[in-house]
Amino acid sequence: MLSKKVVDLLNNQVNKELYSAYLYLDFENYYHDKSLEGFANWYHVQVQEETAHAQLMMQYLQDNDYSVVLEAINKPNIPLNELSDPLKAGLKHEQYVTELIHTCYAAAYEEKDFRTMQFLDWFVKEQGEEEKNASDLISRFELFGHDAKGLYDLDAEYKTRTYIAPSILQTKN
């Protein structure tokens, strides 16, 4: 049995993951409007990943006989004036999500909820990867994105990124 505190935090996390998808849709749209289809694709894949994260949290709650409470998703309010703005905002957001996952994990630990801790282990690892990917995007943009050829090459590379469902999601079907 999960504690009310853990259930509430996991429900909150479902909504934060859905907000993440919504935020990355905004970034995808921004790059599409700038005719940078590769950068748009990179964020399109992020949308799919964040949606999968929400689905995993939802499934965990449902598998443990708890209802999922979906909240309204706020409109992203991040000024996007420079090509690097979504990249920087994306890293900051991933760092925020990492803090949220750690809060869920800490609550599960306090409650001696080892099953939830084991479930969240995947998210802890995933957030490390998400932060590294976001940081690498910024680094590569700073190195190569300030001239037309470099930006063109980065954009072409990011067009090839594809979504791969998390293995723990693939086993749910």
Task: Map each language-model feature to its residues.
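Iron-associated oxidoreductase/ferritin-like identity signal
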Residues: 1-173
